[in-house]
Regions:
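Periplasmic c-type cytochrome electron-transfer domains
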Residues: 4-157
Length: 157
């Protein structure tokens, strides 16, 4: 899933470089932009994917106790960074080791996290979801949780 990038692009869907229709998503970049690192042909953007990304980004269901969403730390008004605290706050009020990076222009990045520990955009969301200080969830538990809720089932097929 392109959770973070889909949420970001969907949030700015009125941008003339992104066109979303019922059947298609087209992404056009100005000629002077560098080529994206992310390979869209391996996971083509779809309208349903953008909706799913936005829903997942803002819904706290991704955290173990459904208290913390991606947007809890990646605040839209702050370029999807976190400016309210020096260190990020996660599940149960736990304090992280660093602040969250902004999540803009991610399709041009080859590594993620402050230390570059993740090197693929599709793998990046797994780090905070499974981190015990951030969202503290297990992927199998999360998938089971999402499949029970009918609003998610349509997008997960």
């Amino acid at each position: 899933l392109l959770i973070t990038s889909a949420a970001f692009i969907y949030a700015y869907s009125d941008n003339p470089y992104f066109t979303i229709t019922k059947k298609d998503v087209s992404v056009k970049f100005p000629a002077y932009f560098p080529k994206p690192v992310y390979a869209f042909e391996n996971n083509k953007p779809t309208p349903a994917g953008f909706v799913l990304g936005r829903m997942l980004f803002y819904d706290p269901i991704l955290s173990r106790d459904s208290s913390t969403s991606c947007a809890s730390c990646h605040q839209r008004f702050a370029a999807f960074a976190h400016i309210d605290h020096a260190l990020s706050h996660g599940i149960n009020g736990l304090i992280g080791k660093r602040n969250v990076p902004a999540i803009q222009n991610m399709i041009w990045q080859s590594s993620f996290m402050w230390d570059g520990a993740v090197n693929h955009l599709e793998q990046q969301p797994l780090a905070p979801i499974t981190n015990p200080v951030e969202m503290d969830n297990e992927l199998i538990t999360l998938m089971n949780k999402l499949q029970v809720i009918s609003q998610w089932f349509t997008y997960l097929l």
